[in-house]
Amino acid sequence: MKKFTLINKARSRIKVFEPLEDSSKKSSMINAILISYGCVFKRSSKPVMKGSRVESIEAARNEYKKLLEDGWVKTYRFNNF
């Protein structure tokens, strides 16, 4: 699973969904998702990340679906910050 970035309609806020792997086990199983959120001040600069939290996979999927329904769109612009 790779990292997904969503941006709102006004292009002022972003949320980044990335897998959180359990490093204590030998198998690289994904059991949670790290959701980071931040603000975009200029399109040409890096976003300012305000915080992050860890959610279960189901809770993260539900939030992802709700954001898409609210008009957020997937973007690749900020994947390398």
Q: Where in the sequence are the language-model features?
A:
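Terminus-proximal functional modules
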Residues: 1-66, 75-81
